[in-house]
Amino acid sequence: MATMRRICFLFVFNLAVATSTQGISDEISPDIPETSQAVIDGHRLKGSSKVSKATTGSEERFIRSQLQFLINKIFGARGVAKVLVEEGPKSGVFNKLKEILVKISKFEMKGDMLYMVYIYTILFLSIPIILGVAMYINHHVESSYIH
């Protein structure tokens, strides 16, 4: 069970890192102000002391609750989830996960992002098959030495 949680965490973390390097910020809906786009990209505009948020308060709470639910399912510990959700906004990974959740909830994923989700889903689903084949081969190799 702990191995499955680690695999799930690595899947989500790798998805966030991969999307941050793929530049999906170009696909963000145009209704987000430029200042918010700069925050999502991890940059701060010069001369702006206050930067507007990309989402409204209710959307932010919904996204945080969805993210906390996801992390609770993966880790099964509310303490870990609370720290990750509350401290996460300081890191770029939280923004990418938030972006993914928004895109999934609005079904606006397209192009490279959708392709990445398909690839990661296929890889994620193939892990048990690969492990099963490896265990099967290992069992037969070990049993051939015994006989």
Swiss-Prot record:
* Record field: transmembrane: 117-137
Q: What are the record keywords, sorted?
A: Host membrane, Membrane, Secreted, Signal, Transmembrane, Transmembrane helix
Localization terms from the record: Secreted; Host membrane
Any one GO CC term of this protein is:
extracellular region
Protein name in the entry? Secreted RxLR effector protein BLN04
Q: Spell out the subunit comment.
A: Interacts with host transcription factor NAC069.
Signal sequence extent: 1-23
- Please name the source species: Bremia lactucae (Lettuce downy mildew)
Tell me, in a sentence or two, what this protein's role is.
Secreted effector that inhibits stress-induced relocalization of the transcription factor NAC069 to the nucleus, thus affecting its broad role in abiotic and biotic stress responses.
Major location (coarse): secreted
Motif window: dEER: 58-61
> What does the entry note on its domains?
Has the canonical EER motif, but lacks the canonical translocation motif RxLR, which characterizes most oomycete effectors identified so far.
- Which family does the record claim for this protein? Belongs to the RxLR effector family.
How is it placed in the membrane, per its record?
Single-pass type I membrane protein
Coiled-coil residues: none
Q: Per its UniProt entry, which superkingdom is the organism in?
A: Eukaryota
